[in-house]
């Protein structure tokens, strides 16, 4: 009996692989399901046969065998922000080689609602990553009841027993404030993201504490959104009525870009009349005409740690949630002046 397999245009099956490798179809299934009870010699023969036939195991069939869907949900706001699109790209880069598929939901809401979590759960995801966003009480309850692994990225939250990975925003804001004070600034504004996120709360706390220690009380706080429009509109209104502001700390680089455009429109030169600091160090800063001083978040490391926690908790339902705060660094360019 010939071992030749019909290699026409149809897709190869596990039966074809078994025939070419000279093993049973059950053995082929065990190899692609991650089974351990297969010798290395047989495993190599099966993988070589699969490569020769360009065999791709059916994901749905594999999930029935392993009881794993190999799907991870990720929910975020404002994908138009280059920071979040970079985050999504890095998550895909980390998870795809491991065989995981990302199910992405871009929320248009300031607060993630219960139905948005429910939508991801319909895909039988093994875990959900929630980026810098607030969860409604209903969404929090839905996650808890589902028993699905959930990891918070770029924030943490009280009341949700989940692991979290984020940049140490408190420390970052302290270092930014210290630098600005040492550069001679005394009249500040902080244009932030949404008011109640851990990100905004920690940055404001760290920034204010440094100013208070230096007996500086002149700080205008403007909550906003992480958008160009928020930065532009906030700065235009602020600088029109208060010409004494000499430094604006922005909750994101995109906010900072809006701030600088508005400042120029109302007659401020940067950095001669107004210093501006961003947050994130997005890639586009390398090719914009704005050499923005900013805080760089260690995105690659943050995503890697998030994926490691996610996979560990998927495999071990009794794993204890961890909170990981990572340090970034101040990137000094040309939007902050030294005051005499």
Language-model segments: residues:
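N-terminal helix-turn-helix DNA-binding module of bacterial transcription factors
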Residues: 1-69, 337-340
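Short beta-strand segments enriched in small/hydrophobic residues
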Residues: 20, 25-30, 64-80, 179, ...
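Flexible loop/turn connectors
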Residues: 219, 241-340
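Hinge/beta->alpha junction and helix N-cap segments in small-molecule ligand-binding domains
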Residues: 76-86, 104-112, 155, 165-175, ...
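Short acidic/polar active-site loop segments enriched in Thr and Asp
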Residues: 24, 70, 126, 186-187, ...
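Alpha-helical structural signal in soluble globular domains
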Residues: 49, 90-94, 142, 146, ...
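Alpha-helical recognition/docking segments in bacterial nutrient-uptake
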Residues: 1-9, 67-178, 182, 240, ...
């Amino acid at each position: 009996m010939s071992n030749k397999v019909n290699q026409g245009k149809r897709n190869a099956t596990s039966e074809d692989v078994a025939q070419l490798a000279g093993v049973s179809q059950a053995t082929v299934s065990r190899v692609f399901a991650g089974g351990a009870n297969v010798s290395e010699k047989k495993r190599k023969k099966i993988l070589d046969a699969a490569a020769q036939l360009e065999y791709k195991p059916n994901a749905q069939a594999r999930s029935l065998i392993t009881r794993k869907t190999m799907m991870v949900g990720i929910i975020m706001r404002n994908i138009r922000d280059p920071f979040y699109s970079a985050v999504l790209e890095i998550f895909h880069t980390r998870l795809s080689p491991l065989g995981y598929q990302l199910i992405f939901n871009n929320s248009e809401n300031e607060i993630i609602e219960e139905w948005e979590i429910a939508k991801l759960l319909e895909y039988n995801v093994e875990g959900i990553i929630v980026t810098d966003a607030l969860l409604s009480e209903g969404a929090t309850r839905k996650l808890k009841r589902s028993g699905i692994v959930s990891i918070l990225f770029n924030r943490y939250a009280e009341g949700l027993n989940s692991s979290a990975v984020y940049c140490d925003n408190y420390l970052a804001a302290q270092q930014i404030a210290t630098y600005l004070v040492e550069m001679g600034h005394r009249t500040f504004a902080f244009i932030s993201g949404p008011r109640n996120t851990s990100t905004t709360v920690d940055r404001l706390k760290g920034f204010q504490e440094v100013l208070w220690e230096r007996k500086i009380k002149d700080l205008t706080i403007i909550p906003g959104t992480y958008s160009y429009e928020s930065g532009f509109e906030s700065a235009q209104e602020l600088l029109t009525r208060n010409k004494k502001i000499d430094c604006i700390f922005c909750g994101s680089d995109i906010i900072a870009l809006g701030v600088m455009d508005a400042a120029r429109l109302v007659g401020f030169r940067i950095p001669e009349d107004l210093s501006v600091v961003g947050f994130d160090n997005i890639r586009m800063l390398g090719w914009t005409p704005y050499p923005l001083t900013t805080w760089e978040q260690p995105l690659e490391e943050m995503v890697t740690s998030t994926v490691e926690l996610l996979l560990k908790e998927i495999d071990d339902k009794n794993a204890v949630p961890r909170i990981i705060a990572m340090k970034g660094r101040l990137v000094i360019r040309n939007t902050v002046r030294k005051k005499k």
